[in-house]
UniProtKB/Swiss-Prot annotation:
Keyword Transmembrane helix carried by entry: no
Gene designation: Pou2af3
Subcellular location: Cytoplasm; Nucleus
Protein name: POU Class 2 homeobox-associating factor 3
Disulfide feature: none
Length: 253
């Protein structure tokens, strides 16, 4: 007997819930139609005061000129757009009131400086030129080019480079770092400033690649701090040098 009322009550509750839902849906449909009709009539009355407040509130507080109107506030409704509108207002106000004075001052001061700069520049250029010469671009470029002219370069070439067949001229073009190595063996009378013989030139030019390692290890590093004029080579190095000199003579023959 106890199970039947529970099933009956449960079924009865489900039926009542369905009925309540149907009633609520019907009531919402009817009330929604009534609210839509009433809201269409009453909405303009509720929105007009707020829009009127937006249009008419800034008028008594604004002390700006006549060109500043309240139409800008009509677009600035959200709180995020209000600072940008205020910045635009301040910029427009500062540009119209404060900027004309510096502009007038700069317009008056500028003519005093620009003519002076325009007059001083030709005067400086004319000082470097010959008096009476025209001051066009060709003469100015010629005056600046006179400081460094490429035609002066061949005057130094005969001093450093002579005729190629002569061996002394070839030796004069060689660097001095490898020059003193030629005077070490068997010719102590040649100092650092004396010219070299053709055999020594052959030794530097053709035979240097063959005996470069031997010269660096035995002669150059051991006697690098001594003078070439005061150097007395040992007997073994003189014999090696005569052998090398004869081989170099064979190269020329």
């Amino acid at each position: 007997m106890s199970e039947k009322p529970k099933v009956y009550q449960g079924v009865r509750v489900k039926m009542t819930v369905k009925e309540l839902l149907q009633q609520r849906r019907a009531h919402q449909a009817t009330s929604g139609a009534n609210l839509s009709g009433s809201s269409g009539l009453h909405l303009p009355d509720t929105t007009m005061p707020s829009s009127a407040g937006l249009y008419f509130e800034p008028e008594p507080t604004s002390s700006t000129p006549s060109y500043f109107q309240t139409r800008e506030f009509s677009t600035c409704v959200s709180c995020e757009e209000i600072p940008s509108c205020l910045d635009q207002i301040f910029e427009s106000y500062l540009q119209t009131d404060t900027l004309p004075e510096p502009l007038l001052n700069s317009a008056q001061i500028a003519p005093h400086y620009f003519p002076e700069s325009c007059q001083v520049a030709p005067f400086c250029h004319n000082q470097s030129l010959i008096p009476g010469s025209p001051s066009d671009s060709s003469s100015l470029s010629g005056s600046f080019d006179c400081s460094y002219s490429p035609t002066q370069l061949p005057s130094y070439t005969p001093e450093n480079y002579s005729s190629p067949p002569s061996l002394d001229s070839l030796h004069s073009s060689l660097p001095e770092e490898g020059y003193f190595c030629q005077h070490w063996p068997s010719h102590p009378q040649y100092n650092h400033s004396s010219p070299a013989t053709p055999s020594s030139v052959c030794y530097y030019a053709s035979c240097e690649a063959e005996h470069l390692d031997a010269l660096r290890t035995t002669e150059f590093f051991s006697y690098s701090g001594m003078d070439c004029a005061d150097f007395a080579p040992p007997v073994a190095t003189t014999g090696d040098f005569y052998k090398r000199e004869t081989s170099c003579d064979a190269c020329y023959s």
